[in-house]
């Protein structure tokens, strides 16, 4: 994928706003709950 400078800037800006310490465990828990039902699609 070739990202433009504007796209890179937007992505970095969004990632800067995410609190990974707070959201990380919640996202992993959701992944563990959904993975069994969607495993065959990946």
Swiss-Prot record:
Globin domain sequence ranges: 2-42
Keyword Hydrolase recorded: no
Keyword Metal-binding: yes
One GO MF term: heme binding
Tissue expression summary: Red blood cells.
Domain of life, source organism: Eukaryota
Keyword annotations of the record: Heme, Iron, Metal-binding, Oxygen transport, Transport
InterPro entries cross-referenced by the UniProt entry: Globin (IPR000971), Globin-like_sf (IPR009050), Globin/Proto (IPR012292)
Family per record: Belongs to the globin family.
Assembly with partners or alone: Heterotetramer of two alpha chains and two beta chains.
Function, in words: Involved in oxygen transport from gills to the various peripheral tissues.
Note: This fish has ten hemoglobins, 8 of which are anodal and 2 cathodal. The cathodal tetramers do not exhibit the Bohr effect, due to lack of the C-terminal His in the beta chains and to blocking of the alpha-amino group on the N-terminal residue of the alpha chains. The possession of both anodal and cathodal hemoglobins may be a physiological advantage for fish living in fast-moving water habitats. This fish possesses 6 types of hemoglobin chains, including a major alpha chain, a minor alpha chain, two major beta chains, and two minor beta chains.
Record protein name field: Hemoglobin subunit beta-A
Gene coding for it: hbba
